[in-house]
C-alpha cells in the first residue's frame, strides 16, 4: 500500500501540500488579545487572502497539488459521521466553564453545514452571536466585556506546526500554547476518517495526547535517514527523545536525529525560523543562533544498546551536517548576508524561512530582498511571493505549508 504521506527530504520536488487560507479568524484578532493569540499585529484580511492565494497559485504553477485544511476536515467529519463527536471534543478543549454556554454553542454549531461549522470553529464564536436566556452564576460573574465564547484560531494558516510529515507518516502535535492547542484536532480527524488518509498506510509516529510539546516548525527532514529537530521555545528535549525511541523501534527508516538547540524566544520560536535546507549541500541560517566561531549546540541521537538512545554532543553544526548527509562540502548561507542590522530585520520577517519546492528552488517572501539576492548569488532559484500582510503572523512560506508528498531524491 502506497502511503498518502511521503516526505523523505526538505528539498525533493514538492507534489502535494496542505494549506489553510486565512479567514474570518484573522479579523477576530483585537489589540487586547493579539499577544495571547501569538500575534504582534493585526493583518488586513482582503490583502492577506490575496497574498495567500498568490502563494497557492505559485505552488500550482510549479506542479504542486494544493489541498486545504478546512475542506479536508469537513470531508473527514462527514465521511466518518463524527460531526457531533468532533464538536463535543472541540468544545471540551475550548475551556468553556459554563454548561449553559457549552450547550448553546453545541446547538448553534451543529445546526450548520459541516464546512460552515468547521470554518466557524476556526473563526471563533462571538458572544453576540448566541442569545443565552438562562444564565448560571458562573456566566454572570464572567468578564462581560470579553467578546468571544470560543476564541479564534488565527495561527491556522501556519499549517506546518500542528502536524508534520515524516517519511511515510507524521506527527500530530501537542502544541505549546493554549492559543494553538486545538489546531491539531483538525489533522487528527483527517487521519482518522478522511478516505484519502485513514487506513491508507500512513503511520502516526506521535499523537496530540502527549504531555510534552512538539511543533512542526522544529521538525526538518534532512534525508530519508536523518532528521533535524529544534530544541526551542515550542519543542522540548523530552519530546525529541520520545520520538527518537518510536522512530528507531518501528522501522521508520530514520537512523539519526540532530537535536539543534536554539534561543527560546518569540522571534526564533521554531528551528525553521532560523535554519532551512534549500539544496543538497546548502542551508539558510540566521547568525543569531551561532556562538563564537559559528558554534551551535547540537545533540546527535542514534540507536544504542538495549533500546536505549545514544546521545553525542557536538558544536560544529557544519561538520555535523556534512557527516550526517555524507557530502564533502556544505554551505551555510547567512540571513541578510550576515549584516548586523539586515540579518535580524529580515529574520523577523522570515528571511530564513524558505520553502524548497525542488533542489535549489525556493519560495520566499519578497520583502526580504537582501536575503533573496544573497541566495541567488549562491545559485539558488528564488521565487518571491508578496508578503506585506502574511508576514504579520511571524511565519514564512515554510511555516504556511505542510508537505504531504515529495519526490524522493536521486541517490
Curated annotation (Swiss-Prot):
Keyword Ribosomal protein attached: no
EC number: 3.5.3.6
Protein name, UniProt field: Arginine deiminase
SUPFAM superfamilies from the UniProt entry: Pentein
Main location: cytoplasm
Keyword Cytoplasm: yes
Assigned protein family: Belongs to the arginine deiminase family.
Species in which this protein is naturally found: Latilactobacillus sakei subsp. sakei (strain 23K)
PANTHER family: ARGININE DEIMINASE
Top enzyme class: hydrolase
Record keywords: Arginine metabolism, Cytoplasm, Hydrolase
Pathway the protein contributes to: Amino-acid degradation; L-arginine degradation via ADI pathway; carbamoyl phosphate from L-arginine: step 1/2
Molecular function per GO: arginine deiminase activity
Amino acid at each position: 500500500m502506497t502511503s498518502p504521506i511521503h516526505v523523505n527530504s526538505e528539498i525533493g520536488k514538492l507534489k502535494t501540500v496542505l494549506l489553510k487560507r486565512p479567514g474570518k479568524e484573522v479579523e477576530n484578532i483585537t489589540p487586547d488579545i493579539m499577544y495571547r493569540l501569538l500575534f504582534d499585529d493585526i493583518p488586513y484580511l482582503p490583502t492577506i487572502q490575496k497574498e495567500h492565494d498568490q502563494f497557492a497559485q505559485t505552488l500550482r504553477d510549479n506542479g504542486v497539488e494544493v489541498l486545504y485544511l478546512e475542506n479536508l476536515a469537513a470531508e473527514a467529519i462527514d465521511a466518518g459521521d463524527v460531526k457531533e463527536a468532533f464538536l463535543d471534543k472541540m468544545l471540551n478543549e475550548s475551556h468553556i466553564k459554563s454548561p449553559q454556554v457549552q450547550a448553546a454553542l453545541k446547538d448553534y454549531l451543529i445546526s450548520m453545514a459541516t464546512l460552515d461549522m468547521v470554518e466557524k470553529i476556526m473563526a471563533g464564536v462571538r458572544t453576540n452571536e448566541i442569545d443565552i436566556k438562562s444564565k448560571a452564576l458562573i456566566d454572570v460573574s464572567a468578564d462581560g466585556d470579553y467578546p468571544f465564547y470560543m476564541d479564534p484560531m488565527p495561527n491556522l494558516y501556519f499549517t506546518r506546526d500542528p502536524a508534520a510529515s515524516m517519511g511515510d507518516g507524521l506527527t500530530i502535535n501537542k502544541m505549546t500554547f493554549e492559543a494553538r492547542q486545538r489546531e491539531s484536532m483538525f489533522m487528527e480527524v483527517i487521519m482518522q476518517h478522511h478516505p484519502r488518509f485513514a487506513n491508507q498506510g500512513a503511520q502516526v509516529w506521535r499523537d496530540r495526547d502527549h504531555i510534552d510539546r512538539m511543533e512542526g516548525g522544529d521538525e526538518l527532514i534532512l534525508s530519508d535517514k536523518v532528521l533535524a529537530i529544534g530544541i526551542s521555545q515550542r519543542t522540548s528535549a523530552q519530546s525529541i527523545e520520545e520520538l527518537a525511541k518510536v522512530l528507531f523501534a518501528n522501522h521508520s527508516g530514520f537512523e539519526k536525529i540532530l537535536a539543534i538547540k536554539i534561543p527560546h524566544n518569540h522571534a526564533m520560536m521554531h528551528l525553521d525560523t532560523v535554519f532551512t535546507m534549500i539544496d543538497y549541500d546548502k542551508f539558510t541560517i540566521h547568525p543569531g543562533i551561532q556562538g563564537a566561531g559559528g558554534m551551535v549546540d547540537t545533540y546527535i541521537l542514534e540507536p544504542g544498546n538495549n533500546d536505549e538512545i545514544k546521545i553525542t554532543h557536538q558544536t560544529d553544526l557544519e561538520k555535523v551536517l556534512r557527516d550526517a548527509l555524507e557530502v564533502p562540502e556544505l554551505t551555510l548561507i547567512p540571513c541578510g548576508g550576515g549584516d548586523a542590522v539586515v540579518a535580524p530585520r529580515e529574520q523577523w520577517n522570515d528571511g530564513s524561512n524558505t520553502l524548497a519546492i525542488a533542489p535549489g528552488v525556493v519560495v520566499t517572501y519578497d520583502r526580504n530582498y537582501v536575503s533573496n539576492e544573497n541566495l541567488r548569488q549562491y545559485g539558488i532559484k528564488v521565487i518571491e511571493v508578496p508578503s506585506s500582510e502574511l508576514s504579520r503572523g511571524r511565519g514564512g512560506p515554510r511555516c504556511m505549508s505542510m508537505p504531504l508528498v515529495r519526490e524522493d531524491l536521486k541517490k
